[in-house]
């Protein structure tokens, strides 16, 4: 041990009241996990919420946190200044890097999309985890316990308690009632709030205050003053004019959900809608569906029942706010039908009601159907909701040749429960198309047997089919 190191070790570390130290560690746990939750929510409009997105994001976050623990364990002096500086940097990254306009601009201008994802996670979320991860090992040096285990146990208790309350309060309360921007401000604000208390008792009281005020002003400017999309815990919404002229439509308006076109309506009388909605409405008319009960899983803009009175509609969507937003900003009038705020999988699994028609039109982002709504078990539950002569329609967005693994396997999952279904490709001039799938209730028919030159029962089967 060098003389300098020995002298530094002989000087007792500057201490703070235990309540202040535990409060700082609590805020670290709250804001670090809060930043992860906000980052996952910011990713939804751009890359969805599939396990292939959330799992790597959590993994990168934990890796950065582990590296932060290691870096904090190597700090051998000036503990409070280190934590104070880390809190300021983390607050700046959270308030600016996780702001809605910044995330939207990042994904709008960086291509391909995985590059924007890596920038958001690698340049914003991971540095936050690394900075805040240093807090517990650094401040453990200042806790007054007889045993090292008691010190680390107390610090980890308050940090984990903060993470628990942060995940609960931000997801269930703040995002639900105030929006995602409010969650960003809460995470950054708590870090800035404790910065003035992270100082040596002999240091000036205003240590860190000017920087905190500057970061707070920037946070408010980016998360409040700049134009924001309507955000809830589940989705990001906006209503705008169609970005391009649409043939046959007069002043079309688009209801955007998570940066994808959820619904379309124009100013004609009667109004025109998106092609798959018009095709589905026409199909119901052709089938003579009148005075029937129709279940729609995934509300979108509620255009399937717009200005119709011939059937009873029940919409199910996970976001309680979508009805008010659609009525106020998109339709300009009350929806036709009833609305239930629930997860579609949970609803179909627990409902005892029966419907003449079930429409599956649920998307989380772009062309992404939530993963739990594509399984064979989900389609089995939808079939259980149908009347004996009922019909199920599903709006899929897949390649127009139905050749990708996703398209093939999704159709296979549906037909594993329903048997052979009708498939109508609505767009043939673009790689991705709306595909309308129509299936019928009842037990699926027997699997077909190919005709061959050796055994060809085509003529017999024609007679059997008449």
Task: Enumerate the predicted regions with their spans.
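Class I SAM-dependent methyltransferase Rossmann-like catalytic core
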Residues: 263-285
């Amino acid at each position: 041990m060098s003389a300098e190191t020995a002298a530094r070790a002989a000087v007792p570390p500057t201490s703070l009241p235990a309540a202040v130290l535990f409060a700082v560690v609590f805020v670290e746990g709250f804001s670090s996990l809060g930043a992860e939750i906000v980052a996952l929510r910011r990713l939804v409009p751009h890359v969805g919420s599939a396990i292939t997105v959330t799992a790597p994001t959590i993994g990168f976050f934990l890796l950065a946190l582990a590296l932060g623990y290691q870096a904090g364990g190597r700090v051998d002096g000036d503990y409070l200044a280190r934590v104070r500086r880390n809190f300021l940097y983390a607050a700046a990254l959270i308030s600016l890097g996780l702001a809605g306009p910044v995330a939207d601009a990042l994904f709008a201008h960086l291509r391909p999309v995985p590059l924007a994802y890596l920038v958001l996670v690698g340049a914003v979320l991971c540095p936050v985890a690394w900075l805040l991860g240093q807090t517990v090992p650094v401040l453990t040096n200042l806790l007054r316990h007889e045993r090292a285990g008691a010190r680390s146990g107390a610090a980890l208790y308050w940090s984990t308690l903060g993470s628990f309350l942060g995940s609960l309060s931000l997801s269930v309360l703040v995002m639900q009632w105030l929006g995602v921007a409010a969650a960003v401000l809460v995470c950054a604000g708590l870090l800035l709030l404790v910065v003035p208390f992270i100082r040596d008792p002999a240091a000036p009281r205003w240590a860190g205050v000017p920087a905190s005020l500057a970061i707070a002003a920037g946070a408010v400017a980016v998360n409040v003053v700049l134009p924001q999309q309507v955000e809830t815990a589940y989705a990001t919404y906006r209503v705008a004019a169609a970005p391009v002229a649409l043939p046959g439509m007069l002043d079309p308006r688009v209801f955007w959900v998570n940066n994808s076109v959820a619904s379309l309506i124009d100013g004609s009388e009667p109004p025109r809608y998106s092609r798959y909605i018009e095709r589905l409405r026409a199909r119901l008319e052709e089938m003579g569906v009148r005075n029937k009960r129709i279940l729609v899983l995934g509300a979108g803009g509620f255009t399937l029942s717009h200005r119709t009175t011939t059937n009873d509609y029940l919409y199910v969507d996970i976001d309680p706010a979508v009805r008010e937003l659609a009525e106020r900003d998109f339709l300009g009038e009350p929806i036709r039908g009833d609305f239930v705020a629930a997860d579609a999988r949970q609803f179909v699994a627990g409902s005892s009601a029966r419907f003449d028609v079930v429409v599956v039109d649920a998307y989380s982002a772009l062309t992404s159907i939530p993963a739990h709504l594509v399984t064979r078990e989900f389609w089995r539950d939808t079939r259980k909701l149908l009347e004996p002569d009922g019909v199920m329609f599903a709006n899929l967005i897949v390649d127009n040749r139905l050749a990708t693994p996703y398209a093939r396997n999704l159709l296979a999952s549906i037909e594993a429960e329903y048997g052979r279904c009708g498939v109508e490709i609505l767009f043939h001039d673009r790689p991705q198309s709306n595909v309308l799938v129509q299936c019928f209730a009842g037990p699926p028919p027997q699997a077909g047997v190919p005709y061959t030159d050796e055994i060809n029962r085509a003529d017999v089967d024609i007679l059997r089919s008449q």
